[in-house]
Amino acid sequence: MSDLCDKTATELRSLIGRKDISPVELVESCIERIETTDKALNAVVTPTFDHARNEAAQAEKAVLDGDDLGLLHGLPIGIKDLEATSGILTTLGSQLYANHVPEKDQGSVANIRAEGGIVIGKTNTPEFGAGANTRNLVFGATGNPFAPGKTCGGSSGGSAVALATGMMPLASGSDYGGSLRTPAGFCGVVGIRPSPGVVAAEGRPVGLLPFSVLGPMGRAGEDAYLLLQAQMGVDPHDPFS
């Protein structure tokens, strides 16, 4: 099953739609890869394996029942630890939020779930996403996938490393001055910085909204675009969306 981890997100989505693979198989494959790879890298700081297994079983049933399937149906996805996730620890990389568990998903995460994406874990970020590296006092540093003792860039470094090592096919990120693009370059993956307002950034100070954006990451351009299509949308809490 571990070979599934190395396929592109678009290929995996097609395989799920054709019933060639099960979302359960895919999630278990990603969990196995995380457990065997991440000890040396520290990319997935809050795994959500039980949650992912439950959602994978529901996704499998939907496929077998012939239900309409979303863009991301059955795909495991990492969420940067700046984005609020219902019932899942969201620290923002800060000791101030070390025990913070939001009651609801923010809009970008809700959109991913609505398209069938399965949250498999939260990925590391510097405190409040401020930095061209990925380290904080809550979880420590994330290593480069090619040389763990070196930097992976930032601030979406946890997502970039998880993608580069096949821990998951898709992951979210954010970008103010390079936080999607820098770690993508350091890790050999793709990060797309959308125009402001394409992906609603609920909860950000209004003064930052024209500059700080949420966006997708993948191992290929078409994968990142697939995630972007799910993330995007209007949100009343973001006046720029």
Q: Which functions belong to the PLM regions below?
A:
Residues C30, A52, G74, K80, ...:
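Conserved hydrophobic/aromatic pocket- or pore-lining residues that grip, position, or stack substrates
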Residues L12-R18, Y97-V101, S212-R219:
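Short, well-ordered beta-strand elements within core beta-sheets of diverse protein domains
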Residues L71-S108:
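Enzymes and membrane/adaptor proteins characterized by extended Gly/Ser/Thr/Asp/Glu-rich
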Residues M1-N54:
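An N-terminal boundary/leader segment
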